[in-house]
């Protein structure tokens, strides 16, 4: 599913596997805004699920789910006219899952889940600082 309402969006989406017929990738995207730069990739074997709902403008989002593990991501950004900068990478053979909901002022958010050990992460954040907020999390071996 792809639903883009607005203009000046830059999107670079790709999905591919290494030839395993049993691996699946699924992506869903809903922007409803303008001036977004979004790069999403889901690579290698292993099931990958990704949902994204922006409802905003001036966002930069980079997401890369790779490796042979099953990875799940559900991301929602909503913040009026403020900007977000989000970088997420879930890699490795472990099953990694993340749910992120960012609201309020600009948030520089980084999440790295990696390795063979299963990792899960959930955050529901509203940035109340006009200068912005920053969150950086790394999990795995």
Regions found by a protein language model. Name each.
Residues 1-141:
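Low-complexity repeat regions of mature extracellularly deployed or surface/particle-associated proteins
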């Amino acid at each position: 599913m792809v639903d883009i309402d607005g203009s000046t969006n830059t999107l670079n989406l790709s999905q591919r596997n290494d030839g395993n017929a049993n691996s699946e990738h699924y992506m869903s995207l809903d922007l409803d805004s303008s001036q977004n730069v979004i790069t999403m990739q889901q690579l290698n074997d292993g099931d990958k699920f990704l949902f994204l709902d922006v409802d905003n403008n001036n966002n930069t989002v980079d997401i890369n789910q790779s490796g042979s593990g099953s990875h799940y991501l559900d991301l929602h950004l909503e913040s009026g006219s403020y900007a977000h900068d989000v970088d997420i990478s879930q890699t490795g053979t472990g099953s990694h899952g993340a749910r992120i909901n960012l609201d309020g002022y600009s948030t520089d958010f980084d999440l790295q889940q990696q390795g063979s050990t299963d990792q899960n992460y959930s955050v529901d954040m509203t940035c109340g600082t006009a200068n912005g907020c920053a969150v950086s999390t790394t999990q795995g071996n």
